[in-house]
Amino acid sequence: MNIHEYQGKDILRKFGVAVPKGIVAYSAEEAKQAAEQLFAEQDSPVVVIKAQIHAGGRGKAGGVKLAKSPEEAHEIASQMLGTTLVTHQTGPEGKEVRRLLVEEGMNIDREFYVGITLDRATSNNVLMISTEGGMEIEKVAEETPELLLKIQVDARFGLQGFQAREAAFFLGLEGEQFRNAVSFITALYNAYTSIDAALAEINPLVVTKEGRVLALDAKINFDSNALYRHKDFIELRDISEEDPFEVEASKSNLNYVRLDGNVGCMVNGAGLAMATMDMIQLAGGRPANFLDVGGGASPQTVEEGFKIILSDKNVKAILVNIFGGIVRCDRVAGGIIEAARKIGLNLPVIVRLEGTNADIAQKMLDESGLNLIAADGLKDAAQKVNQALSA
């Protein structure tokens, strides 16, 4: 689960992670009042107005601006609120700006990158440090890997003092800046583990000319499987920032991820779903979604799955690929027939059913009178999808 920058900073602040003073604003008038308060409390000649959306690259898209007075903050907020911000992470449709973070200005000396996430290859948390703050860390890792330090942290023992110092040394810091960086990194790791985060990313981490070390930006992603331990975090979810198809799918406990292709996929099991998407791509099609109906697929979940797939106007054909282990193929077939009659499937539907009660399921589909295309094997299914698209 993703949250906004200001929410992430509020959480980090509770763990002793240094962040700038900031106030969230939902209107231009609130932005002006926030600026007045910050100007009264700080020496900086500017405040920063930051659009709050679940995407990076806001600065280049015009979502981060400086204001030298409360009146200018009001003007900037008026222009920014309600606009659609398009960045390299939002896609061409962009995201609407509904709230702003008004933050104290910083006298920046240097910018760095600090991030913590799980390294699935080693089953350890990994602390990532780079001298290239403000850059996309993937680009740094690919083009200048020598500027990125990765420190494996054994979850049994946590971040050790020598590891935090190694990170600060890598950044070339000395004296008070060095000590502040060590404290910052230690506090960030404690926050990351305490809240069951999947990612804690500070980009940039700034060192001011006064020697302060602060998180100028913060991105926190929660492990959704651990949210039952942090029920207070659930209220931080902003559904308006999420894909509406994915929100609707979550209501039916369907694992759905929207993609930009033209072939709707309904599969049971994440591994089979990934293989199905690969086969569609290899056959010349493009998957429009990842949809895992799970091991307990019922006629109701199949029907809901069809509704969500058909909500995407880019879908030109649908592939149903079910391997019946725990799931009975006849139950899935019943869901397909029921959904087809209720919804009115006007698109080509290719069905591949294997496993428990597959023969019964195929008979049900044959006798349904519906225009369903049977497939024998995954490769055959993918080829028939491509043929249907070409027809």
UniProtKB/Swiss-Prot annotation:
Binds 1 Mg(2+) ion per subunit. Pfam families: ATP-grasp_2, Ligase_CoA. Mg(2+) binds at N203, D217. Its cofactor is Mg(2+). GO terms for cellular component: cytosol; succinate-CoA ligase complex. NCBIfam families: PRK00696.1 (NF001913), sucCoAbeta (TIGR01016). Succinyl-CoA synthetase functions in the citric acid cycle (TCA), coupling the hydrolysis of succinyl-CoA to the synthesis of either ATP or GTP and thus represents the only step of substrate-level phosphorylation in the TCA. The beta subunit provides nucleotide specificity of the enzyme and binds the substrate succinate, while the binding sites for coenzyme A and phosphate are found in the alpha subunit. It is an enzyme of class 6 (ligase). HAMAP family: Succ_CoA_beta (MF_00558). The keyword Magnesium applies. InterPro entries: ATP-grasp (IPR011761), ATP-grasp_succ-CoA_synth-type (IPR013650), ATP_grasp_subdomain_1 (IPR013815), Succ-CoA_synthase_bsu_CS (IPR017866), SUCC_ACL_C (IPR005811), Succ_CoA_ligase-like_bsu (IPR005809), Succinyl-CoA_synth-like (IPR016102). Substrate binds at N268, G325, I326, V327. Belongs to the succinate/malate CoA ligase beta subunit family. Heterotetramer of two alpha and two beta subunits. This is Succinate--CoA ligase [ADP-forming] subunit beta. PROSITE patterns: ATP_GRASP (PS50975), SUCCINYL_COA_LIG_3 (PS01217). Residues 9-248 form the ATP-grasp domain. The lineage of its organism: Bacteria, Pseudomonadati, Chlorobiota, Chlorobiia, Chlorobiales. GO terms for biological process: succinyl-CoA metabolic process; tricarboxylic acid cycle. ATP binds at K50, G57, R58, G59, E103, M106, E111. Pathway: Carbohydrate metabolism; tricarboxylic acid cycle; succinate from succinyl-CoA (ligase route): step 1/1. It catalyses: succinate + ATP + CoA = succinyl-CoA + ADP + phosphate; GTP + succinate + CoA = succinyl-CoA + GDP + phosphate. Its EC number is 6.2.1.5.
